[in-house]
A protein has these predicted regions:
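Residues at the starts of beta-strands that form the adenosine-phosphate
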Residues: 28-31, 76, 113, 152
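Short, hinge-like loop/turn segments at secondary-structure boundaries
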Residues: 48-51, 78, 132-134
Length: 165
């Protein structure tokens, strides 16, 4: 099963994804693939908050760029947190659009159950600079790619999860 949970920043996506993946794991430790690179103190604090909430319930893998490689032969379930930060990393490291889309295609081919967490960035204004527009456009393409293939798609707003597929 492949599940997408999308929503705004601090909307409750991660909490819902963590609860769901634990249910899917049937008592085993699910894999938590963390994609964030610790580039500033504020981001470090966000990551620490996530680590505290997770505790010892997950097997954590930290990989900011090569997600499929980190998950090869994995016997899920896997929670990927989050594709928005991964996309940020990919653009920062100047991965081509083709490589970005191919990575998502490969993640969708994983045999194990996967929950993808991604911020919904397409509800605001069109950004005023090229890099921000590229980020928003690619994020939207990734969301569509996942939405088409995932068995279930959920939108989280104000801590409330709504299934939309």
């Amino acid at each position: 099963m492949k599940i997408l949970i999308t929503g705004g920043v601090k909307s409750g996506k991660s909490r819902h994804a963590e609860t769901r993946i634990l249910e899917m794991a049937n008592g085993k430790k699910p894999v938590y693939l963390a994609t964030t690179e610790l580039l500033d103190p504020e981001m470090e604090e966000r990551v620490l908050e996530h680590r505290r909430r997770r505790g010892e319930k997950f097997r954590t893998i930290e990989e900011p760029l090569h997600l499929t490689d980190a998950l090869l032969n994995m016997e899920g379930p896997v929670l990927i947190e989050c594709l928005t930060m991964w996309l940020n990393n990919a653009l920062h490291h100047q991965l081509s659009e083709k490589k970005i889309i191919t990575e998502i295609e490969n993640l969708l081919l994983l045999k194990c159950d996967v929950i993808f967490v991604q911020n919904e960035v397409g509800l605001g204004i069109i950004p005023d600079n090229l890099l921000a527009r590229k980020f928003a456009d690619l994020s939207g393409r990734i969301a569509q790619q996942l939405g088409e293939v995932c068995d279930e798609v959920n939108l989280c707003a104000a801590g409330i999860l709504v299934q939309i597929k």
